[in-house]
Amino acid sequence: MMDYTNFETKDMKNRKLKEHIFNVALTLMKQIGYDNITIRMICTEAGISTGMFYKHFSSKEDILAFYYDKAQSDFDEVIDKQLAGLSLPQQLVAFYVWVCGFTADLGVDFCRNFFSSKNQRMNTNLFHNKMIEITNRCIETACEKGFQLSSGRTPYAVSKDLCVMVKGIIFDWSAHEGSYDMAEFAQGLLSRCIGGLL
């Protein structure tokens, strides 16, 4: 019988390479700023050809969008491990505190460019927005188990409000050059506000 424990599919290899390119771009972004990096610089540092870059990303801006894909792979694990057994308000606060910590690790320059009104992935009305989808799921599950939202509130409205608040936290953190602990700030603000949102 063959041992498949070290077997890598083409998709797995492509994902690894895409993450490598993203991480190289992120390092360069932290060193010299997003506006100062070029695709050629990324390729040189990553040890790949420009053709290989374009096989994985359509543009420099597309690298920013990969943040979302990268984060999504961690979301379900966070839900399963960190939120299990918590009350709904605690789940929502813990999830967004995690998002803020994950985002802060990417650096100020990344945040300024990704969390921009020009970035269509940040449109809170997009149906596929994973953060809203996750918080909706948490709220709907809690409601099925007897949690009652305030009159006139829906899971989507709560999720959208939370998402907008967190984007505001990220914007403020970026405007202040990352001078404070974003996750800690989010913990305090969301803990104070969560009751009014539900």
Model feature map: region roles:
Residues 24-28, 98, 102, 165:
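Short amphipathic alpha-helical elements of helix-turn-helix/winged-helix folds
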Residues 1-16:
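N-terminal intrinsically disordered/low-complexity leader segments
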Residues 100-122, 171-175:
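Amphipathic alpha-helical segments used for helix-helix packing
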Residues 20, 28-62, 66:
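Helix-turn-helix
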Residues 14-25, 42, 67-71, 75, ...:
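Generic hydrophobic, amphipathic alpha-helix propensity
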Residues 66, 77-105, 159-162, 183:
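Hydrophobic alpha-helical connector segments
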Residues 114-115, 145-190:
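Hydrophobic/aromatic-rich alpha-helical bundle segments in the mid-to-C-terminal region
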